[in-house]
UniProtKB/Swiss-Prot annotation:
InterPro entries: CB, DNA_brk_join_enz, Integrase-like_cat_sf, Integrase_catalytic, Tyrosine_recombinase_XerCD
Source taxonomy: Bacteria, Pseudomonadati, Pseudomonadota, Alphaproteobacteria, Hyphomicrobiales
Key words, A-Z: DNA integration, DNA recombination, DNA-binding, Plasmid, Transposable element, Viral genome integration, Virus entry into host cell
Domain annotation Tyr recombinase: ranges: 104-301
Coiled-coil positions: none
One biological process term in Gene Ontology: symbiont entry into host cell
A molecular function (GO) term: DNA binding
Family the entry assigns: Belongs to the 'phage' integrase family.
Domain Core-binding (CB): 6-83
Transmembrane regions listed in the UniProt entry: none
Protein name: Putative integrase/recombinase y4rE
Keyword field contains Transmembrane: no
Highest taxon in the source lineage: Bacteria
Natural source organism: Sinorhizobium fredii (strain NBRC 101917 / NGR234)
Entry keyword annotation includes Zinc: no
Length: 310
């Protein structure tokens, strides 16, 4: 290994440790950075880290424009860290690889639309009643708790306290477990699902809380496929993007709308919502303030009436 590759490898590992200490999972990014070290070693590059070095590495993967932009973004932020130790490190341009399209804005469902989405679950796989009930319970939980879809499908039976209505969410996006209390109506729905699930699969293949029609853990792909079917049956497949993650946005927007209506101090309550949602930074939660035209209008009215205190 060359001296530069060794130096780079040491800094990459320290940078990964730093990101972990800040609460980030950083697994995919760590893989990209370690691959970059191997690339530098194979090419026998010497210091300093240059723009050309980074561009050639990113282009060596091929793939979609968004993948290249993501890899380059990981390197750009690492280069900023590396420059502290080697001032000759070249700064990478922010938009060297433009993304092919913007991420679609979240779609915030009305109460009627959410109800139609849940009602439509009964129409999928009518010969397998548990599948429809699984989707209905999942969608209700996503909408009422703001959990990420990945967090929901990873729930084990031991993570769901049906007596007290509390979920233990493990392996979150930022590597921290958290307790999530649910509403009494959600608790009742989870209890009903557990009874029906156990009747259908008295000897399940694993300890997952949500099961597929085969009796094993419902996968993220299974959730996406089921959601697409339900969306179509509900008449919401109308050209406007609707993803399971939009239910998380809806939860946050609904909660903040309620706080505005109650004339509560939303900024002071953001840390509470951030903890509940499992955000590492309050700024991530503040993003939801822009998630709804109605919410923006409400916040603007509060700011006007209260002299700027929203």
């Amino acid at each position: 290994m060359t001296a530069f590759a060794r130096f780079l490898g040491e800094k990459v590992e320290r940078y990964i440790d730093l990101r972990h200490s800040l609460g980030y999972a950083f697994s995919k990014q760590a893989g990209t950075l370690r691959a970059f070290v191997r690339y530098v070693e194979r090419a026998q590059f010497d210091a300093p880290a240059t723009r050309t070095m980074a561009l050639d590495f990113v282009l060596s993967f091929g793939g979609a424009a968004n993948s290249r932009a993501t890899r380059h973004g990981v390197l750009r932020r690492f280069y900023e860290y590396l420059a502290v130790y080697d001032a000759q490190t070249e700064a990478l341009k922010r938009r060297a690889f433009p993304r092919s399209r913007a991420i679609p804005p979240p779609r915030i469902l009305s109460e009627a639309e959410l109800a139609s989405l849940i009602d439509a679950c009964a129409r999928i796989s009518p010969g397998i009643p548990l599948r429809g009930l699984t989707m209905a319970t999942l969608i209700g939980l996503l909408a009422s708790s703001g959990l990420r879809s990945g967090e929901v499908v990873r729930l084990d039976r031991s993570d769901v306290d049906l007596t007290n209505g509390v979920l233990l969410v493990r392996k979150t996006k930022f590597r921290k477990d958290r307790l999530v209390p649910v509403h009494a109506t959600t608790q009742t729905a989870l209890c009903r699902y557990a009874r029906e699930r156990d009747a259908a699969f008295p000897s399940p293949k694993d300890q997952a809380f949500f099961l597929s029609s085969r009796g094993n853990r419902l996968s993220a792909t299974g959730l996406q496929c089921g959601f697409a079917q339900v969306r179509k049956f509900a008449g919401l497949d109308d050209g406007k993007t609707l993803r399971p993650h939009d239910l998380r946005h809806r939860f946050a927007v609904t909660r903040m709308s309620l706080w505005h209506q109650q004339r509560a101090n939303v900024q002071a309550l953001l840390p509470v919502l951030a903890t509940y949602l499992g955000h590492a930074n309050y700024s991530d939660t503040a993003y939801y303030l822009t998630g709804s035209v109605d919410l923006l209008a409400m916040a603007a009215e509060r700011a006007f009436l209260d002299g700027g205190a929203a």
